[in-house]
Amino acid sequence: MKFKDKLKFYVITDSNYSDEVISVEESLKGGATSIQLRMKTSSTRKMIEVGNKLRKLTSEYDALFFVNDRLDVAQAVNADGIHVGIDDMPVSKIKEIAPNLIIGASAYNLDEMKTAESEGADYLGVGAVYSTNTKLDARDLGINGLKNISKIANLPIVAIGGINHSNVENVLKCGVSGVAVVSAIVGAENILKSAENMNELIKKYIK
């Protein structure tokens, strides 16, 4: 299976909603194919401690494991990849230091998409498709903006931002390779059930 095929159901951690290890295990049981560890305010030691546990879980479920922003942590926990924003370490520099990592890059507009592609990113995280409380600095792109980027992008696209069970089908109709979800999964009362339901919706569009 190519890495692109594992981008279809991409869950991002958020300890404001639930414990990372518990939420990831339930998400994986429910069909998640990629996990991203995002711990913006935690110490490096804590990130590595949690990251090692998530690496073990993702390996057991044959899912991809990404670390948000932190190349040092991604390397320390033997992650499959890293996801960076436009203000983080340039993709080209990451490729120089860690050529084996899968690199995802955030893109809020066409210029950022072109920058990510030219620097050698492996996939794009495109959004925010809808307003979201989990990333307050995100700029809303909207469905039309997502469609426009999807039409011309040369890389797999993972849509992100405010995606939930009621709007995910509209997002998938834009021709993306996957959807990244935070609160709709890790913030759910029953994470396993929520993940299973989301997985069924995704499978209608991406096999």
UniProtKB/Swiss-Prot annotation:
Q: Which InterPro entries does the protein's record reference?
A: Aldolase_TIM, ThiamineP_synth_sf, ThiamineP_synth_TenI, TMP_synthase
Name the cofactor(s) required for activity, per the record: Mg(2+)
Metal-binding keyword on record = yes
Which reaction does this enzyme catalyse, per its entry? Answer: 2-[(2R,5Z)-2-carboxy-4-methylthiazol-5(2H)-ylidene]ethyl phosphate + 4-amino-2-methyl-5-(diphosphooxymethyl)pyrimidine + 2 H(+) = thiamine phosphate + CO2 + diphosphate; 2-(2-carboxy-4-methylthiazol-5-yl)ethyl phosphate + 4-amino-2-methyl-5-(diphosphooxymethyl)pyrimidine + 2 H(+) = thiamine phosphate + CO2 + diphosphate; 4-methyl-5-(2-phosphooxyethyl)-thiazole + 4-amino-2-methyl-5-(diphosphooxymethyl)pyrimidine + H(+) = thiamine phosphate + diphosphate
- GO terms classed as biological process: thiamine biosynthetic process; thiamine diphosphate biosynthetic process
Instruction: Return the Gene3D superfamilies for the record.
Output: Aldolase class I
Q: Where does 4-amino-2-methyl-5-(diphosphooxymethyl)pyrimidine bind?
A: Q36, L37, R38, M39, K40, N68, S106, K135
SUPFAM superfamilies per record: Thiamin phosphate synthase
Give the function comment from the record. Condenses 4-methyl-5-(beta-hydroxyethyl)thiazole monophosphate (THZ-P) and 2-methyl-4-amino-5-hydroxymethyl pyrimidine pyrophosphate (HMP-PP) to form thiamine monophosphate (TMP).
Provide the family line. Belongs to the thiamine-phosphate synthase family.
Which protein, by its recorded name, is this?
Thiamine-phosphate synthase
